[in-house]
């Protein structure tokens, strides 16, 4: 009773120090609730008070309430308070523990909480040391079967082994035996360290034993023993959720591919467990590969080992970074490389890459006046529809396989478009030559097609030379008016050449500076370039006789 009074007095003495030292409710408050020191209603009340006034005030109120409880609750509080995780979390509790009286023992049993007495008739009798399970007897009898005379050694009879779970003996009895060879005595056991996440229900590090069991057929079957459970590759595949493909390149490819922690066994072998999950395994399609397909141990791209992802359609394996595009994480379910996907597409659609037959041109009737300039020059000749005028047919042609390059243009041919003098006569570009004599001296520029020419070469009969609006021989018979503001001049090739008329009557107004500036501002350079190409694509007119 003196100890109970001392613990209560120490709690009242260090109440404020403990409240200040505890700066968070976890893990102390939760541990008190787990050990039934604080009831659920008081636990929730302390959490609400912590949110309102802070953690120190909430714990001070909790300790004040604890002083009103019995001595057993106070003793349990001190035990929980001085646990290792609380001392690590709350550093200010260490001085309180150091100043704790040495004569106060916190390890004394609880009072008033003794377990109920069990009648002696219900207590099971102690197990006799000579009573063993069938698995232990099989292991003890194994040396007797392998001795030359078949007599059991006395040491094997006296050696007792720890009991194992009944499941282990049942599993061993299912395994076939033959020719007096005991399963467990002839097995080769190799210890492999595995993580607890690889085996369902395991906590902490477990020890797996890779057992190669010998059967009468001379073959072998690999399984992993964890505690008393034996896991075969079929068990891993049934219990595992997803199909894991990441693996290490050392050693042969195992029956089970796992992505979890891997431990190399002595002798170069590996033990791999299927990773457990909640998603059910996908059903195997007829085209899916075998589950025991052997993949390569090196990347098919860089020919290096390491963490690889295995293709389900071929034996190749790849690094995630070597794929194109690279993957950041291992995809779930069935995964195939690009070669397998391409082969599958070719099988489903063998003629997908064949060129489609060219469709005949579709002819659409249009009212007069809506045909674009130069349409007859660009479009190939075709048969018109029956009973329809050829001038009212607009042909929709399919796109050609490849666009033909534009004809090369001399920069001097386009330069006069941007160099118009103040008098309306275009300035001469360096290197401009007459198309008849080839001389570049005193050449003129046609105001319609911008071609360089000599007046004497194009008009040798002595036709009078006008002051403005000079045109070459080809454009002198063109009745199309010169381009005005906002309108591009149509191609002269569409119009049939007519007889020469009076210069004053046949010549249209020249392209003045204001018209050209308006044309450049309202139309793109592509339109001007197209107009220049159409103007220069006409054949030269014959010389007058």
Curated annotation (Swiss-Prot):
Q: Which Pfam families match?
A: HSR, PHD, SAND
The biased composition feature labelled Low complexity covers: 140-152
**Consequence recorded when altering residue 326 to Q:** In APS1; alters folding of the PHD-type 1 zinc finger
Compositionally biased spans, kind Pro residues = 116-128, 358-368
After translation, how is this protein modified? Phosphorylated. Phosphorylation could trigger oligomerization.
Q: Tell me which residue ranges form PHD-type zinc fingers.
A: 296-343, 434-475
Q: Name one GO molecular function term.
A: identical protein binding
| Effect seen on changing residue 303 to P | Alters protein folding and abolishes interaction with histone H3. No effect on doted nuclear localization. Dominant-negative effect on target gene transcription
Name of the protein: Autoimmune regulator
Q: Which organism is it from?
A: Homo sapiens
């Amino acid at each position: 009773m003196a100890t109970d009074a001392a613990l209560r007095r120490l709690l009242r003495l260090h109440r404020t120090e403990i409240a200040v030292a505890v700066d968070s409710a976890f893990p102390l408050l939760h541990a008190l609730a787990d050990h039934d020191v604080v009831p659920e209603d008081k636990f929730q009340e302390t959490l609400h008070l912590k949110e309102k006034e802070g953690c120190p005030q909430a714990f001070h109120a909790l300790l004040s309430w604890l002083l009103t409880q019995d001595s057993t609750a106070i003793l349990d509080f001190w035990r929980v308070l001085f646990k290792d995780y609380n001392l690590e979390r709350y550093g200010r509790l260490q001085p309180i523990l150091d100043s704790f009286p040495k004569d106060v023992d916190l390890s004394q049993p609880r009072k008033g909480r003794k377990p109920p007495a069990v009648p002696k008739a219900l207590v099971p009798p102690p197990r006799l040391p000579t009573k063993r399970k069938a698995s232990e007897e099989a292991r003890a009898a194994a040396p007797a079967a392998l001795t030359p005379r078949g007599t059991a050694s006395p040491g094997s009879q006296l050696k007792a082994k720890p009991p194992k779970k009944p499941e282990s003996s049942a599993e061993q009895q299912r395994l076939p035996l033959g020719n007096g060879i005991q399963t467990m005595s002839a097995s080769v056991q190799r210890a492999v360290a595995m993580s607890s996440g690889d085996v369902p229900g395991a906590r902490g590090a477990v020890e797996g034993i890779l057992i190669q069991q010998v059967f009468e057929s001379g073959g072998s079957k690999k399984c992993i023993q964890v505690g008393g459970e034996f896991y075969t590759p079929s068990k891993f595949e049934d219990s595992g959720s997803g199909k894991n493909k990441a693996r290490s390149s050392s050693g042969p490819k195992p029956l089970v591919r796992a992505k979890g922690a891997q431990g190399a066994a002595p002798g170069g072998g590996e033990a791999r467990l299927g990773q457990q999950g909640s998603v059910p395994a996908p059903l195997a399609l007829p085209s899916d590969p075998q589950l025991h397909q052997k993949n390569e141990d090196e990347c098919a791209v860089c020919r290096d080992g390491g963490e690889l992802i295995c293709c389900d359609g071929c034996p190749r394996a790849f690094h995630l970074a070597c794929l194109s595009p690279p993957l950041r994480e291992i995809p779930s379910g069935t995964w195939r490389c690009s070669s397998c996907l391409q082969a599958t597409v070719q099988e489903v659609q063998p003629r997908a890459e064949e060129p489609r037959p060219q469709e005949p041109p579709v002819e659409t009737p249009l009212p007069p006046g809506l045909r674009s300039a130069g349409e007859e020059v660009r479009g190939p000749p075709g048969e018109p529809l029956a009973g329809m005028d050829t001038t009212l047919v607009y042909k929709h042609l399919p796109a050609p396989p490849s666009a033909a390059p534009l004809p090369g243009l001399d920069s001097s041919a386009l330069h006069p478009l941007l160099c118009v003098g103040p008098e309306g006569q275009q300035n001469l570009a360096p290197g401009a030559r007459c198309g008849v004599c080839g001389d570049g001296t005193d050449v003129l520029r046609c105001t319609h097609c911008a071609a360089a020419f000599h007046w004497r070469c194009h008009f040798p009969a002595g036709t009078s030379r006008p002051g403005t609006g000079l045109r070459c021989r080809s454009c002198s018979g063109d009745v199309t008016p010169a381009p005005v503001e906002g309108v591009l001049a149509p191609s002269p090739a569409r119009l049939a050449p007519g007889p020469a008329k009076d210069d004053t009557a046949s010549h249209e107004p020249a392209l003045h500076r204001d018209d050209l500036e308006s044309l450049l501002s309202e139309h793109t350079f592509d339109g001007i370039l197209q107009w220049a190409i159409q103007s220069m694509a006409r054949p030269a007119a014959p010389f007058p006789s």
